UniProtKB/Swiss-Prot annotation:
High-level lineage: Eukaryota, Metazoa, Chordata, Craniata, Vertebrata
Gene name as annotated: Tle4
Biological process annotations from GO: cellular response to leukemia inhibitory factor; negative regulation of canonical Wnt signaling pathway; negative regulation of DNA-templated transcription; negative regulation of transcription by RNA polymerase II; Wnt signaling pathway
CDD domains membership: WD40
Location of the protein in the cell: Nucleus
Modified residues (Phosphoserine): 183, 187, 191, 197, 220, 225, 240, 244, 248, 267, 296, 298, 394
Bias (Basic and acidic residues): 158-177, 190-227, 248-264
Sites bearing Phosphothreonine, chain numbering: 293, 300, 302, 309, 315
Subunit comment: Homooligomer and heterooligomer with other family members. Binds PAX5, LEF1, TCF7, TCF7L1 and TCF7L2. Interacts with ZNF703; TLE4 may mediate ZNF703 transcriptional repression. Interacts with SIX3 and SIX6. Interacts with PAX2.
Keyword annotations from UniProtKB, A to Z: Acetylation, Nucleus, Phosphoprotein, Repeat, Repressor, Transcription, Transcription regulation, Ubl conjugation, WD repeat, Wnt signaling pathway
Region entry GP domain, spans: 113-179
PROSITE patterns in alphabetical order: WD_REPEATS_1 (PS00678), WD_REPEATS_2 (PS50082), WD_REPEATS_REGION (PS50294)
Protein name: Transducin-like enhancer protein 4
Start-end of Polar residues biased regions: 292-303
Length: 748
């Protein structure tokens, strides 16, 4: 533009002699106008280019979206091709067995027909995608595998095992081509007989094994509840009580060895909790009617067909783990992708990886972390993993592969308090700010604070112990298992047999909760049945004096009012039933939970009730007015809760292994992250200064109220499912998955 101006000035200067100042001023003004016009033109051009750039950016985004969509389709087709290839191989093997039984003429005729069909099938399958494969006697399987390899190569998903598998298939097919040049029928018979003697025999054995596993896994809970309740302890440590933590109360940290520990995968057939899924054959609990998968949401549950059912004191039930359909297992190696790492813990009671204090996971399942804040480069791989589950993986029904990712991420700046160990207790303010808790000097010392717990007795119940309770004064322990409650006298450590056995419910139904009235003369029992049994313990021989029948197929937890006049039962349909114990009638139902009500506790003055449910909510109820007071929404199912006797704090145990201690009148709360599994039960000491929390990780932990300093920890040989504390806070009883209850003496 400057050169143009100089030319303009030169052209105007030479034709005529220089005039007075007026023409010169006119030239400058004209030049300024021209500059202004050119600037406006450039500005308009810039604006146009900017709009075009934005349009291209939006088109790029749209193309990326289409790419991901087509990637999913391609990957799904790839998996479908693998499935079809496997079907073809098996059909070929069957034909190879059947054809030799025919006459010679029929053998040749059928072999020719089979070859024709194989060629046409191969051509029709590969042509639409632009792939052409040479003719093979077993060309369908080879062509399909080659197509799968090509598709996989485009998506960068096949791994070394797949390539090796493909190479072996191609080599075998090339060998079959050479033999086919002599006699198609003879080569077909020879190659298929050879395959029959090797591949088909192994495939048939594998298929039979899979069918047996499926039959065993899909058997009804009513018939297989024993198997479903066996806890896999083959890779767990033996029982060894632990003393107080070595770190000082101000450290608020974990041992590094505990953070670095990796839990061995448990068998899908093994289950962690005593509270099995209620018998689908006879009960049809709300477990199967309207359960929810706890996802990151506040209050809208997502229906599913097999959520866990909680047990006594929020002891969760178990989700049956179906086997893989026949024909899918041989494809497993072909379907593995870097993003589709199989989770070794298929049920909500699998040991949940403990979140590091900066949000990372310390288990093999951590590969799923990238799926939650996934980069654009990995979006296609995530879509491929989703497609794998949709098309070929046949994932476990209701399986939530990200259940361990629901642990709230902890910001990197909250990794710990000075001292070098990561924090496990955090204070969450009203505005959501998380800060590690500096424990006070008296966190682990002082009146009413125990030093450790010593195991003094083992009660061999013989069945998985889902519910326990201690009498007041401390003399008898009641353990609830399968179809009965056993009564133990713990004042005589040498007595290894129960003093009585109370048969209730049906023989195959598990007791989920048992509660003693304050006078110790009446026991109320509930579980996987629609009836509650009321036992008269004061009679010469304990007997059932009444039964309360509700419309719900199961009761998960019980609470008794302080005046012993009213019983509250958590029903599998989400309702809270209120029973008049004197008249033995149903007087009211609190309705609010959209899924099974799993746990319950009542205030000391008997005016307020707290309930937790599988709908990810905790609700409080005014017992005088019969209405709901508050609702707290969480991102995980609620398995247990406890109301502090002092009346200020409510502790909530969740499926995602967190414990949250809420203030009942203020928005402040504490989050505790020390455990590595779902919180199956929770109980406050009667002094209110500490509470215990057993779990699937075989640990019994004692915490300081409310900030959660770890007081002591005891290791058991199996999952700890239920617990109770004596009225004098001197004894703790736990029920576990290895068919026993353990009595601890609390040492102060």
């Amino acid at each position: 533009m400057i050169r143009d101006l100089s030319k303009m000035y030169r052209r105007r200067a030479h034709p005529a002699p220089h005039q007075p100042a007026q023409p010169f001023k006119f030239t400058i003004s004209e030049s300024c106008d021209r500059i202004k016009e050119e600037f406006q033109f450039l500005q308009a051009q810039y604006h146009s280019l900017k709009l075009e750039c934005e349009k291209l950016a939006s088109e790029k985004t749209e193309m990326q979206r289409h790419y991901v969509m087509y990637y999913e389709m391609s990957y799904g087709l790839n998996i479908e091709m693998h499935k079809q290839a496997e079907i073809v191989k098996r059909l070929n093997a069957i034909c190879a067995q059947v054809i030799p039984c025919l006459s010679q003429e029929q053998q040749q005729l059928q072999a020719q027909h089979l070859l024709t069909w194989t060629w046409s099938a191969c051509a029709s399958d590969t042509t639409p995608l632009g792939f052409s494969q040479p003719f093979h006697p077993s060309g369908s399987s080879a062509g399909l595998l080659a197509l799968s390899s090509a598709l996989g190569g485009q998506s960068h998903l096949p791994i070394k095992d797949e390539k090796k598998h493909h190479d072996n298939d191609h080599q075998r097919d090339r060998d079959s081509i050479k033999s086919s040049s002599v006699s198609p029928s003879a080569s077909f018979r020879g190659s298929e007989k050879h395959r029959n003697s090797t591949d088909y025999s192994s495939e048939s054995k594998k298929q039979k094994t899979e069918e047996k596993e499926i039959a065993a896994r899909y058997d009804s809970d009513g018939e297989k509840s024993d198997d479903n309740l066996v806890v896999d302890v083959s890779n767990e440590d033996p029982s060894s009580p632990r003393g107080s933590p070595a770190h000082s109360p101000r450290e608020n940290g974990l041992d590094k060895t505990r953070l670095l520990k990796k839990d061995a995968p448990i068998s899908p057939a093994s289950v962690a909790s005593s509270s099995s899924t209620p018998s689908s054959k006879s009960k049809e609990l709300s477990l199967n009617e309207k359960s929810t998968t706890p996802v990151s949401k506040s209050n809208t549950p997502t229906p599913r067909t097999d959520a866990p059912t909680p047990g006594s004191n929020s002891t969760p039930g178990l989700r049956p783990v179906p086997g893989k359909p026949p024909g899918v297992d041989p494809l497993a190696s072909s379907l593995r992708t870097p993003m589709a790492v199989p989770c070794p813990y298929p049920t909500p009671f699998g040991i949940v990886p403990h979140a590091g204090m900066n949000g990372e996971l310390t288990s093999p399942g951590a590969a799923y972390a990238g799926l939650h804040n996934i980069s654009p480069q990995m979006s296609a791989a995530a879509a491929a993993a989703a497609a794998a589950a949709a098309y070929g993986r046949s994932p476990v029904v209701g399986f939530d592969p990200h259940h361990h990712m629901r642990v709230p991420a902890i910001p990197p700046n909250l990794t710990g308090i000075p001292g070098g160990k990561p924090a496990y207790s955090f204070h969450v303010s009203a505005d959501g700010q998380m800060q590690p808790v500096p424990f006070p000097p008296d966190a682990l010392i002082g009146p009413g604070i125990p030093r450790h717990a010593r195991q003094i007795n083992t009660l061999n119940h013989g069945e998985v112990v889902c519910a326990v309770t201690i009498s007041n004064p401390t003399r008898h322990v009641y353990t609830g298992g399968k179809g009965c409650v056993k009564v133990w006298d713990i004042t005589d450590p040498g007595n290894k047999s129960p003093v009585s056995q109370l048969d209730c419910l049906n023989r195959d139904n598990y007791i989920r909760s048992c509660r003693l009235l304050p006078d110790g003369r009446t026991l109320i029992v509930g579980g996987e049945a629609s009836t509650l049994s009321i036992w008269d313990l004061a009679a010469p021989t304990p007997r059932i004096k009444a039964e309360l029948t509700s419309s719900a197929p199961a009761c998960y937890a019980l609470a008794i009012s302080p005046d012993s006049k009213v019983c509250f039962s958590c029903c599998s349909d989400g309702n809270i039933a209120v029973w008049d114990l004197h008249n033995q009638t149903l007087v009211r139902q609190f309705q609010g939970h959209t899924d099974g009500a799993s746990c319950i506790d009542i205030s000391n003055d008997g005016t307020k009730l707290w309930t937790g449910g599988l709908d990810n909510t905790v609700r409080s109820w005014d017992l005088r007015e019969g209405r709901q007071l508050q609702q707290h929404d969480f991102t995980s199912q609620i398995f247990s809760l406890g109301y502090c006797p002092t009346g200020e704090w409510l502790a909530v145990g969740m499926e995602n292994s967190n414990v949250e201690v809420l203030h009942v009148t203020k928005p402040d709360k504490y989050q505790l992250h020390l455990h590595e599994s779902c919180v199956l039960s929770l109980k406050f000491a009667h002094c209110g200064k500490w509470f215990v929390r057993p779990g699937k990780d075989n640990l019994l932990n004692a915490w300081r109220t409310p900030y959660g300093a770890s007081i002591f920890q005891s290791k058991e040989s199996s999952s700890v499912l239920s617990c109770d504390i004596s009225a004098d806070d001197k004894y703790i009883v736990t029920g576990s998955g290895d068919k026993k209850a353990t009595v601890y003496e609390v040492i102060y």
